[in-house]
């Protein structure tokens, strides 16, 4: 489990928190004992977005990307292990990006989300890379331009997160997802992530031969042999 734990700054994306997040993701992806990565938070705020204190003091980089936030988002999406986000508090700006980047994101129905950047004189640039593919154009345009807050239930309707549940059910819902993921083979889970990320970028002409070769590699793996043998033996 990776926990955003800078409650004093509402888990805002400063240099330390962002670097720590990237390092934790890297370590978890490299640890053979880790099967699923859970991203959660301490306190009442999931992530307040950019650390404005650092920006105003001149200690923060002018672009989130230069302090590794883009790398963290990319690693969440392209890393071989599934990332499940558990969100029970506010997610603003970059916090929405973290929720959108996760493979499966579950929030409480009353959690607050918002693309509030325009009200600070900027725009949701880095997080647009992970948010826009999940949203319809008209809804994205309105959310980006108006900067209003919306609930976890509405975030699910927009496609930003997987689903929203009552607050009392959040832990059970997250655990149910984790239990399902643990039933999958580690290599198979990574392969499934890769398919979802890469196939939509290809033309059908390119996708079919690529997928056929990829499938052949998977079926030839030791993990597949073990999995199919277990299935046939009803293990």
Predicted regions and their residues:
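Glycine- (often His-adjacent) and acidic-residue-rich active-site loop
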Residues: 19, 33, 41-76, 91, ...
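Conserved CoA-thioester-binding segment of acyl-CoA-metabolizing enzymes
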Residues: 1-42, 74
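Crotonase-fold acyl-CoA enzyme core
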Residues: 74-186, 221, 226-229
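Charged catalytic carboxylate motif
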Residues: 16-20, 68, 75, 173, ...
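Helix-loop "lid/cap" segments that line or gate small-molecule binding pockets
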Residues: 143-144, 155, 195-199, 214-219
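Terminal peptide-recognition signature
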Residues: 2, 6, 20-21, 39, ...
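Acidic-histidine catalytic/liganding microenvironments
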Residues: 31, 79-80, 234
């Amino acid at each position: 489990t990776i926990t955003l734990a800078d409650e004093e700054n509402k888990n805002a994306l400063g240099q330390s928190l962002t670097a720590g997040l990237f390092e934790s993701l890297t370590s978890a992806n490299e640890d053979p004992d880790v099967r699923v990565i859970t991203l959660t938070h301490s306190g009442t705020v999931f992530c307040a977005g950019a650390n404005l204190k650092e920006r105003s003091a001149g200690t923060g980089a002018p672009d989130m990307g230069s302090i590794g936030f883009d790398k963290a988002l990319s690693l969440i999406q392209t890393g071989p292990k599934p990332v499940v986000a558990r969100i029970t508090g506010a997610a603003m700006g970059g916090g929405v990006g973290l929720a959108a980047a996760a493979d499966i994101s579950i929030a409480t129905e009353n959690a607050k989300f918002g693309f509030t950047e325009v009200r600070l004189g900027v725009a949701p640039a880095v997080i647009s890379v992970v948010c826009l593919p999940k949203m319809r154009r008209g809804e994205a345009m309105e959310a980006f331009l108006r900067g209003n807050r919306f609930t976890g239930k509405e975030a699910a309707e927009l496609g930003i997160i997987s689903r929203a549940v009552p607050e009392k059910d959040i832990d059970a819902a997250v655990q149910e997802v984790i239990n399902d993921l643990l039933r999958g083979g580690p290599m198979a889970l990574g392969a499934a992530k890769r398919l979802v990320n890469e196939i939509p970028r290809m033309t059908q002409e390119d996708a079919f031969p690529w997928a056929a070769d990829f499938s052949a590699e998977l079926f030839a793996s030791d993990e597949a042999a073990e999995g199919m043998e277990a299935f046939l033996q009803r293990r």
